Amino acid sequence: SFFAPMWWVSLTAPNYPEHIYPNGVRIVLHWTGVANGCTAQTRERDEIQEDEVLDCVEEMNTINHYIGMFPIERGAQLEMKAAPYLFVAFGVLAVVGLFYTGPFWWFLFVPAIALQVGFLVDFAGWLYWFGHNLHEWAAFTVKPFMPTVFGEGKVAQFSTYSFPDYGMGLSIAASVCLVLAVLQRRKQLLA
C-alpha cells in the first residue's frame, strides 16, 4: 500500500462546473505526499481543453487561502519524510516476529497491523489543525471548523467529500493477513 493512494478529498461548488471538474477539485493523499486528483491530469495532453485546470492541489490551496487556511503542503511534513523508514522498520519488526519466541512476540506485529489506524489519526489531527489555525487576514471569515475526515460535509458553499482510496483497502487487507499470520504463529507456539 506504500505506493498506492490512501485517501482522497474533493470539493464541489457551483463555480466549479461538473463538465470541467467531473470529480470536483480533488486531491489524493499518499504516504509520501499529496497528489493531483483531477481527471484532466490523467488524460492525454491533446484531450485537455484550455479551460480545464491541471493542478487540483494548487486549486484547493487557492480556495483554502480565501478562508485563511494554510497550504496543504504544510501538513504532515515529518510524517511524509519518515514514512519510507517506518514502512521498512515495521516490515523488519514483522519478520523478526516470525522468529522471535520470547514474551510479547506478538507485539512486533502491532505497528504493521495498526498502520492505517495511525494514518487516520494523523490525518484527522492535521485536518483539525488546518481548520482551527485560520489566518485573520482571510478574504472570507469563517469560524474555526473540523474538516470532514470521512464522508460528506459542507463548508460555506462547498460540498466536501473525504473517502478512502484503494491503498487503504490494500493496507487493511495486509493487516488482516498479518492478524491471521499472528494467530497461526500463536497456534504453533502453543503446540
Feature roles, as predicted:
Residues 90-121, 179-191:
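Juxtamembrane interface at the cytosolic side of transmembrane helices
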Residues 102-105, 158, 168:
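Conserved aromatic-histidine-acidic binding/catalytic patches
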Residues 3-77, 124-162:
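Long, glycine/tryptophan/cysteine-rich extracytoplasmic
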Residues 78-99, 169-178:
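Hydrophobic alpha-helical transmembrane segments
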Residues 2-3, 120, 173:
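Generic structural signal for bulky hydrophobic/aromatic residues embedded
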Residues 164-188:
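A hydrophobic membrane-anchoring alpha-helix module
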Residues 86-93, 97-100, 118, 139-155:
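Alpha-helical context
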